[in-house]
Curated annotation (Swiss-Prot):
Residues 1-25 form the signal peptide. It holds the Pfam family Thyroglobulin_1. The gene is Igfbp6. Interacts (via C-terminal domain) with PHB2. It comes from the Eukaryota. PANTHER family: INSULIN-LIKE GROWTH FACTOR BINDING PROTEIN, INSULIN-LIKE GROWTH FACTOR-BINDING PROTEIN 6. Disulfide bonds join C30-C33, C49-C55, C63-C76, C70-C96, C148-C176, C187-C198, C200-C220. IGF-binding proteins prolong the half-life of the IGFs and have been shown to either inhibit or stimulate the growth promoting effects of the IGFs on cell culture. They alter the interaction of IGFs with their cell surface receptors. Activates the MAPK signaling pathway and induces cell migration. This is Insulin-like growth factor-binding protein 6. Residues 214-226 have a biased composition (Polar residues). Residues 92-148, 205-226 are annotated as: Disordered.
Amino acid sequence: MTWDGLPTQPLLMLLMLLFAAGSESALAGCPGCGPGVQEEDAGSPADGCAETGGCFRREGQPCGVYIPKCAPGLQCQPRENEETPLRALLIGQGRCQRARGPSEETTKESKPHGGASRPRDRDRQKNPRTSAAPIRPSPVQDGEMGPCRRHLDSVLQQLQTEVFRGGANGLYVPNCDLRGFYRKQQCRSSQGNRRGPCWCVDPMGQPLPVSPDGQGSSQCSARSSG
């Protein structure tokens, strides 16, 4: 099963192995924390690499959940149109980027460039009667703004803390599609050799009625296609 089917993987063991690998790679770069990484304390390069948390990644540099974190004001995010955003962050294939809010994206799309009015607006001024039909809002363009993607971002921010507190058993990491909405099947992480429970949801994450035979993902696909 792919990375999107997280319940088939021993998630906690994988996270700890990734953390150990990230720590070794950070320490191997001492002094100076390695290329593309800045130290918290520029006055003591060796001390900056004494621990994994002592190094910061600059904007545009690779990052992940358990490797040196991004510098203040930056956030580790998957690349645009990344098919498996969780996997990318776990294996350190994210990028340090400046956090973008919904208002910022909306402002960019709503303001015309150079102060020029849009052709549709000019047509309305010439022919007011032709603008009677309401304009339908365009679908979500940025997958990061989907409900599942917002949920995933909040989980990733808390993931490292929960693992070290021992509270990550049965962890639920939302399974998102490319547009940031929920995939049909959602599952909790595996617990030892036992697979975590799964359930079916709609694109907004609302649980769907349980099928009588409870056949997991096949039933989710069949129900959505019917």
